[in-house]
Swiss-Prot record:
PANTHER family: SUCCINATE DEHYDROGENASE, SUCCINATE DEHYDROGENASE [UBIQUINONE] CYTOCHROME B SMALL SUBUNIT, MITOCHONDRIAL
Localization terms from the record: Mitochondrion inner membrane
Pfam families linked to this entry: CybS (PF05328)
Membrane topology: Multi-pass membrane protein
Record's subunit section: Component of complex II composed of four subunits: the flavoprotein (FP) SDHA, iron-sulfur protein (IP) SDHB, and a cytochrome b560 composed of SDHC and SDHD.
Name of the protein in its database record: Succinate dehydrogenase [ubiquinone] cytochrome b small subunit, mitochondrial
Lineage: Eukaryota, Metazoa, Chordata, Craniata, Vertebrata
Organism: Pongo abelii (Sumatran orangutan)
Amino acid sequence: MAVLWRLSAVCGAQGGRALLLRTPVVRPAHISAFLQDRPIPEWCGVQHIHLSPGHHSGSKAASLHWTSERVVSVLLLGLLPAAYLNPCSAMDYSLAATLTLHGHWGLGQVVTDYVHGDASQKAAKAGLLALSALTFAGLCYFNYHDVGICKAVAMLWKL
């Protein structure tokens, strides 16, 4: 209540109420009957939010990509204890695939957010793809020709 009083002192008698209760996002249904449709003073700093039209929103592929990123993250949460409890070659290759994919998608978001310009972004994404492919190939080589990821981590813990 003190916040509403403070806003009304700053924005005028109806400003605080208009700021907090006239927007459909915040206004409860039982309060809307008591509010009158008065124009909101522009000097109070109230702005209307315009949502982007449906045809400008992301594609279905972006939604599936986001969902698959979450699935891989949850899969890693289950794979790590399972690999500790049951170290075998299937776990080693599963970890190699999911860790590489998780790292590739995470670093891809870093490239998207922080690398600017078309040419440099394409070069960074190509370098990331090469790094991810080499990482996966190296982990698979390590799993096939050496002790594997699970046993290597266990050996590191014994040190």
